[in-house]
Amino acid sequence: LSLRFIEVMRTNDNSAFFERHHTPGAAVAAKLEAMGWLPMLRPSGAGPAIDYAQPNAPGRIGIIAPYGKDFCATCNRLRVSAKGKFHLCLFGEHGIDLRPLLQADSQLDALVARIAKLTGTKPFAHHLHDGISGGTPHLASIGG
């Protein structure tokens, strides 16, 4: 059994909700550790989640804390929206249109080359700590 806690993230349409309901991932981690849950070592490249385990528990609890230390440094996620926009970060200003390259199998090599080139431009960090959530109106719009 695996359970994931995803820290609520500010987006363009949820400022009031965020202010009322945001619980830092660090607070959840502190409570888990106080109850005997221990952070597990994860292999490099495993993504930004921090998993906790307890010897007497049947599963794990993971925390995805975008406001936490080193979150962006460990992020290995990219998204393509239903509209064909490629998002290097959930909180970027805009997506990059890949739709023309998604229309035909004959475009596969060009698509792979474009994604490889763009991946090298992934930003090092979001600006959530500054109250800037980018151009995403809400995470559902890009599959988040």
Task: Specify the residue positions occupied by each region the protein language model found.
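Radical SAM enzyme [4Fe-4S]-AdoMet core and its adjacent flexible, acidic
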Residues: 1-62, 109
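Short secondary-structure boundary segments
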Residues: 7, 65, 90
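Glycine-rich, flexible loop/turn motifs
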Residues: 14, 19, 48, 68-71, ...
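Mixed-charge, polar/low-complexity N-terminal
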Residues: 52-53, 59-62, 66-68, 129, ...
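Active-site oxyanion/phosphate-handling segment shared across diverse enzymes
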Residues: 55-85
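Flexible mid-to-C-terminal extensions adjoining Fe-S/redox cofactors in radical SAM and related proteins
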Residues: 73-144
